[in-house]
Amino acid sequence: MALPPYDPNFTLAFSYGRRDNVFENDPEHDESASAAIVAVELISSARLALKLDSVRTEYSAQYLVDKAGSRNLRRRRKLTVKDCLNFALKKGGIPRAEDWPPLGSESKTPSSYEPALVSMKGEVIEPKDMDEVPELLVHQSAVGAKLHVFTPHIELQQDAIYLPRQVSMRATLDLEMG
């Protein structure tokens, strides 16, 4: 998926608070859309690395928002990357970007329209702790990571990296070497 042009007015979408009382800072940029973009980028990277696609292929993030997102409306929560990947695998695939309206498009496809799906199979693996991560990195073709950024702590550390107490020294060394 091609990156959008630089927008100096863009602000990151984030939420804070308990799950039943979530506050968002940017109504224009949605968490679910961001998760769908990351998911299709992971899918594209994995398919290219496994030589299932001969060139980098753009897949439809909007399809994931429309289809996987409609399942989450009943539960009233935002999509995550894991939700998007699980949906694509359960569905058996997702369409290419050109076969579905672009992300953020107001136009909707007719309910009877069924695009050709590019077949997908695999599994979403989430490690329980940092000790499982090196094993996954060796054996998996595409890896996504959730990064928590603590801006106030970075500023307090004079631009150094903040490491919470829960992170082991071994994990710190692996990150520095990797």
From Swiss-Prot:
The keyword Transcription regulation does not apply. Expressed in seedlings, leaves, stems, inflorescences and siliques. Keywords: Cytoplasm, Nucleus. Induction: Target of TAS1 (trans-acting siRNA precursor 1)-derived small interfering RNAs in response to temperature variations. Up-regulated by cold (at 4 degrees Celsius). Highly up-regulated in seedlings exposed to heat shock. One of its GO terms (biological process) is response to cold. The keyword Cytoplasm applies. GO terms for cellular component: cytoplasm; nucleus. It comes from the Eukaryota. Its main location: cytoplasm. It is found in: Cytoplasm; Nucleus. Mediates both basal and acquired thermotolerance. Involved in the mechanisms necessary for quick response to heat and subsequent heritable transgenerational memory of heat acclimation (global warming) such as early flowering and attenuated immunity; this process includes epigenetic regulation as well as post-transcriptional gene silencing (PTGS). Belongs to the heat induced plant HTT protein family. This is Protein HEAT-INDUCED TAS1 TARGET 5. It comes from Arabidopsis thaliana. The lineage of its organism: Eukaryota, Viridiplantae, Streptophyta, Embryophyta, Tracheophyta. The gene is HTT5.
